[in-house]
From Swiss-Prot:
Subunit: Part of the ribosomal stalk of the 50S ribosomal subunit. Interacts with L10 and the large rRNA to form the base of the stalk. L10 forms an elongated spine to which L12 dimers bind in a sequential fashion forming a multimeric L10(L12)X complex.
Protein name per the record: Large ribosomal subunit protein uL11
Family: Belongs to the universal ribosomal protein uL11 family.
Gene responsible for this protein: rplK
A GO molecular function held by the record: large ribosomal subunit rRNA binding
Origin species: Thermosynechococcus vestitus (strain NIES-2133 / IAM M-273 / BP-1)
Highest taxon of the lineage: Bacteria
A Gene Ontology cellular-component term: cytosolic large ribosomal subunit
Post-translational modifications: One or more lysine residues are methylated.
UniProt record, GO biological process: translation
SMART domains: RL11
């Protein structure tokens, strides 16, 4: 018989830097999950993406066991890294903070494809382009 899911927890954690301190500890602790086991597994599976924020969806079962699915890093983080900026613009319609090329845009869209609600790479590129525009990042050819 399949195990019954009692909770689904969504967190965005720095890759390779999960520790039992808040926000991870309290979020998992209230469901009785072994926090250290989660931290070790998460850090091992994200060791190749250090420096990125990697969202994770944790399913907690009745017997306090858990499974988790890693998502792709947020588009905004990927855009910031590509443009070499610290953060997006406070007023994107007036002040531009950086720019990325179409090739970089395509690369980000390909990386985000599994988590985007898009059927082809062109649609994914339009979604990422919108995110970039809202951050004050211009797209150059």
């Amino acid at each position: 018989m399949a195990k019954k899911v009692v909770a689904v927890i969504k967190l965005a954690i720095q890759a390779g830097k999960a520790n039992p301190a808040p926000p991870i500890g309290p979020a998992l602790g209230q469901h009785g999950v072994n926090i250290m086991m989660f931290c070790k597994e998460y850090n091992a599976r994200t060791a190749d993406q250090v420096g990125m924020v990697v969202p994770v969806e944790i399913s907690v079962y009745e017997d306090r066991s858990f499974t988790f699915v890693l998502k792709t890093p947020p588009a905004s983080v990927l855009i910031q890294k590509a443009a070499g900026i610290e953060k997006g613009s406070g007023e994107p319609n007036k002040k531009k903070v950086g720019s990325i090329t179409r090739a970089q845009l395509r690369e980000i869209a390909e990386k985000k494809m599994p988590d985007l609600n898009a059927n082809d790479i062109e649609a994914a590129m339009r979604i990422i382009e919108g995110t970039a525009r809202n951050m004050g990042v211009t797209i150059t050819d």
